[in-house]
Amino acid sequence: MIKQELRDKDTKELHIELLGLFREQFNLRMQAASGQLQQTHLLKKVRNKIARVKTLLTDNTGV
């Protein structure tokens, strides 16, 4: 998902997106722990997406 698409979403949609990313990160971490994860770069990509969504949530709330 590109940055502009994320910026167009409201706070509720960003929270839903964040929840999905946390689930994806959890699944990837479990695969890595069990030795089944072949594409380890996906962990970093998901972590960066989480940071991007959290940044947008902070910008939207103005805290």
Curated annotation (Swiss-Prot):
The keyword Ribonucleoprotein applies. InterPro entries: Ribosomal_protein_uL29, Ribosomal_uL29, Ribosomal_uL29_sf. GO terms for biological process: translation. Keywords: Ribonucleoprotein, Ribosomal protein. The keyword Ubl conjugation does not apply. It comes from the Bacteria. PANTHER family: 60S RIBOSOMAL PROTEIN L35/50S RIBOSOMAL PROTEIN L29 (PTHR10916), LARGE RIBOSOMAL SUBUNIT PROTEIN UL29C (PTHR10916:SF0). This is Large ribosomal subunit protein uL29. NCBIfam families: L29. The lineage of its organism: Bacteria, Pseudomonadati, Pseudomonadota, Gammaproteobacteria, Candidatus Palibaumannia. GO terms for cellular component: cytosolic large ribosomal subunit.
